[in-house]
Amino acid sequence: MLVDSAPGMTVVGEAGTGREAVERARSCRADLVVMDIRMPDLDGIEATRRIAADDDLAGVRVLVLTTYDTDEHVVEALRAGASGFLVKDTRPADLLDGIRTVAAGDALLSPGPTARLIARALRAPAVPAADGALPAALDRLSGRERQVLALVARGLNNAEIAAALSLSPLTAKTHVSRIMGKLAARDRAQLVILAYESGLITPGANGAP
């Protein structure tokens, strides 16, 4: 009822299990899936992973809902491909804003409560790639691109990155797009995760949340 009442939004399908969520994402061609972490017959993390790994669903974004912002599975959902998360007691207006911003690609990474939640979730130690793939991937970035990535991880949008580095907004946007391409990231949420997991930035350092 909430989503259908919002201008420009339509519920195209509903699912009671994780497996159904993946099937509905494929059959309904949704732009965005609001995913519960805790569901029967395939939890939300695995469902998110399958959606993110499906080439036919490359444009579908996943917004995860969790009961508590300390849910230990939040970071797993982000690593699986979720573009952001909200706690279930989020106000209706904020939920709609979250849907709009995740659909736009960078919504829940703006400075504020959600950025702090993401940073807190990412304090969980990452499992480093056996072959050092993450740090090696960062070697593909120029010095300027590393600066931009660090600012993305802090939750800055393109305009704020441009102001911080004395760039034009278009140049900042171009840098972000190139970084996504070089790191094979789906969206800005994935860039944040890569920045933390690679050690480029750590919670509480260099102004991070």
Task: Report residues per predicted region.
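Short hydrophobic/Thr-rich beta-strand motif most characteristic of the beta2 strand and flanking loop
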Residues: 8-16, 24, 185
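Acidic catalytic/metal-coordinating carboxylates
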Residues: 17-20, 43-49
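Active-site beta3 strand of CheY-like receiver
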Residues: 28-34
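Active-site residues of response regulator receiver
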Residues: 36, 66
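Receiver (REC) domain active-site loop signature in two-component systems and cognate sites
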Residues: 39-40
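Short, flexible helix-to-coil linker/hinge segments that flank and couple to helix-turn-helix
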Residues: 74-79, 84, 89-143, 147, ...
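Recognition helix of helix-turn-helix DNA-binding domains
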Residues: 155-190
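Basic, Lys/Arg-enriched C-terminal extension of HTH/homeodomain DNA-binding domains
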Residues: 180-209
